[in-house]
Regions:
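PLP-dependent amino-acid enzyme catalytic core
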Residues: 1-284
């Protein structure tokens, strides 16, 4: 919302214009809602490996999907670079403007979380917060919340929760971009430092495996009937690790950012879990 409104304010796009973005799905869903409100055309470049549920939701909201093969950021075939190229090719083709959202390096992303998410957390906890943890996709949430909360209390501990296969844990802990393993989670973890993540005020980092994340979300579904996606499992896993580090009497906040229904064909699919040799809940 903030990124699109900023583009409209700066006359980069207006009603009838084209929004283009490379996204693993969830930001795209948000953009699709915003595009409808402002009368914009939305083109989404998405890795074809993403869940069919997210892709169908995007289509239902009116987005045009351009599916590409999954490729690392270093490749010219990476979905983010593809979206930029398409935006450049379409530039000038629409009198109402063509705008590449660039969520990973558009720092309005970070500013939005300083102004909204951080303030909401501070208000909802009445300032009684000792730590915040989340994973990184664009880095906007972690950067914005870390800045916003530390403006209120510099002693609040900010931690990254990183899936296997991502390089950011190594970046925070050892100041080098290295990775090991892999993850089935979608839209989080990266091999580079984005313009948004550059701004993050991070004190610590934790790695969370798919096995840990899945066991957490399966237990939540069984015990509390809350159905979450893999990113939420990674976030909760990191929050548990920070809570164990800080000890009793501390309030830790994280983000439950993805509903499980968007991953029914994957993490709530018995055949998929078996094919990946991942934990299988007794109720599935």
């Amino acid at each position: 919302l903030f990124m699109v409104e900023n583009a409209i304010k700066n006359k980069k796009i207006q009603k009838g214009g084209i929004l283009i973005e490379g996204t693993a799905g969830n930001t795209g869903i948000g953009l699709a809602v915003v595009a409808k409100v402002y009368g914009l055309i939305l083109k989404i470049v998405i890795p074809r490996t993403q869940s069919i549920e997210k892709k169908q939701t995007l289509k239902d909201l009116g987005a045009e999907l351009i599916e590409v093969d999954a490729a690392p950021y270093s490749s010219s075939e990476n979905y983010i670079k593809k979206s930029k190229k398409i935006a450049e090719e379409l530039s000038g083709s629409n009198q109402n403007g063509v705008f590449w959202v660039n969520q990973f390096d558009n720092v309005i992303n970070t500013e939005s979380h300083i102004k909204t998410t951080a303030r909401e957390i501070w208000t909802q906890t009445a300032g009684q917060i000792h730590g915040f943890v989340c994973a990184v996709g664009t880095g906007g949430t972690l950067a914005g919340v870390s800045i916003g909360l530390k403006e209120k209390n510099k002693n609040i501990k900010i931690a990254l929760s990183d899936p296997m296969g991502s390089s950011l844990y190594s970046h925070i802990k050892f100041n080098k971009l290295e990775n090991s393993g892999s993850s089935i989670t979608e839209g989080i973890g990266t091999g580079r430092v984005t313009k948004n993540f550059e701004k993050a005020l991070v004190d610590d980092a934790f790695q969370v495996t798919d096995e840990e994340a899945l066991n957490i979300i399966f237990k939540l579904k069984e015990d509390q009937k809350i159905e979450l996606g893999g990113s939420s499992g990674i976030n909760i896993g990191g929050a548990i690790k920070l809570a164990q580090l800080l000890g009793p009497g501390h309030n830790i906040v994280t983000i439950l950012c993805d509903p499980g229904k968007r991953y029914a064909s994957k993490i709530y699919n018995k055949e998929f879990l078996l094919s990946k040799n991942l934990p299988l809940p007794s109720w599935l």
